[in-house]
Amino acid sequence: MKYADLHIHSNYSDGTMTPENIIKLAIENGLKSISITDHDSISSQYVAKKYDNINVIPGIELSTEYEDLELHILGYFIDINNQNLMKTVEKLNQSRLERVEEIIFKLQKIIYILQ
């Protein structure tokens, strides 16, 4: 029987393992196919495509909003060289950085008040 794991996060998003370690562990455990679907990132795909002893399906988990709901959409067999995808990922990452900066600013104000 063939097994696959099609929803894995690496340390390029909110996972703890490198893409290399994920692939090595998948091979050791007999998986035939995997997809590293990092949040709003395709960086792990450049590492993953170097392996030919396991089927690595290029994937991503895109964040979006619909009617005040945060949604995550999984995409498989993505073209990591697609310029529109690259621009979208860059916008999402820029947005994330801005949110982090805003959170840090608010936390600094709270810490100052507590001092």
Predicted feature locations:
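Extended substrate/RNA-proximal surfaces in nucleic-acid metabolism proteins
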Residues: 51-115
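An N-terminally biased module of ancient metal coordination in phosphate/nucleic-acid-related enzymes
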Residues: 1-70
